[in-house]
From Swiss-Prot:
Residues 2-237 form the PABS domain. One of its GO terms (molecular function) is spermidine synthase activity. HAMAP family: Spermidine_synth (MF_00198). This is Polyamine aminopropyltransferase. Pfam families: Spermine_synt_N (PF17284), Spermine_synth (PF01564). Its EC number is 2.5.1.16. Belongs to the spermidine/spermine synthase family. GO terms for cellular component: cytosol. Spermidine binds at H62, D86, D155, S156, T157, D158.
Length: 283
């Protein structure tokens, strides 16, 4: 009998991957965690039935959430990562010798433990000496921090369940306070394509705009995320990613599978329907 993983993107659209075997299934205090093995996408894991990471396409997401801000400000030294229990965001950050400290706040320790065992491709740098792990609520963590970080990356789940608090006005305001005077905030910004995801995207964008003087959105194509069209938010107290001297990033000699400085410029060029959504977030 064939085994298929199926995710409902809407009540009328489903996405499926043929599964060779289920490697893990468990429930933490926060969510259900499943790990599957497939021929097409390698090992992948889901939270409450929603796709988080696959071995085959994780490089796209992690390249874009890390290298865009790092190319915008090459002097980033102290980083806070919220969520990111699979470790892929931390893995990419550790490639920068200039980074001195990475604090990672993940509410669910079991996610990290499972990814260490079944997804070493993404979790293999969590033991880097610059990395400190905090298993607590990211919303509460940033409340007590002020003027500490050069970069905050919010690598969260969708705006419901354990990740819901990471899409609030209070949270973004606390991130602003936790950043230094030239700090950058980057977050996964959902998809603009399906209505439910678009609502979450617009709500998050509106709240970030209320907090930061520089607020932009960029995009990537991620095959296993709903619609494949995925957005990221870029907010800053000072730096505009389109006016930065990003060519200096090439001098670092980092080998990436997705990100490059041409793509950096192009990813901020948005389709008209997305531009209209962002222009109308106040309505």
């Amino acid at each position: 009998m064939e085994l298929w993983y199926t995710e409902e993107h809407t009540d009328k659209v489903r996405f499926s991957i043929k599964v060779d075997e289920q490697l893990y299934s468990g429930k933490s205090d926060f969510q259900r965690i499943d790990v599957f093995k497939s021929q097409e996408f390698g090992t992948f894991f889901t939270l409450d039935g929603l796709m988080m990471v696959t071995e085959k396409d994780e490089f796209i997401y992690h390249d874009m959430i890390v290298h865009v801000p790092m190319a915008t400000n090459p002097n980033i030294k102290n980083v806070l990562v919220i969520g990111a229990g699979d470790g892929g965001t931390v893995r990419e950050l550790t490639r920068y010798e200039t980074i001195e400290k990475i604090d990672m706040v993940e509410i669910d320790k079991l996610v990290v433990d499972v990814c260490r065992e079944y997804l070493p491709q993404t979790a293999n740098k969590l033991d880097d000496p610059r990395v400190s792990l905090f298993f607590e609520d990211g919303l509460k963590f940033v409340r007590s921090v002020e003027n500490k970080y050069d970069l905050i990356i919010v690598d969260s789940t969708d705006p419901f369940g354990p990740g819901e608090g990471l899409f609030t006005r209070e949270f973004y305001g606390n991130c602003f306070k936790a950043l230094k005077e030239d700090g950058i905030l980057v977050n996964q910004h959902e998809s603009p394509y399906y209505e439910e995801y678009a609502r979450g995207m617009k709500r998050a964008h509106k709240r970030i705009k209320e907090c930061f003087p520089v607020c932009r959105v960029y995009q990537a194509h991620i095959p296993t995320y709903p619609s494949g069209h995925w957005l990221f938010g870029f907010a800053s107290k000072k730096y505009d990613p389109l006016n930065a001297n990003i060519e200096k990033w090439n001098d670092l000699g980092l080998k990436t599978k997705y990100y490059n400085t041409d793509l950096h410029k192009g990813c901020f060029a948005l389709p008209n329907y997305v531009k209209e959504m962002l222009e109308n977030v106040d309505e």
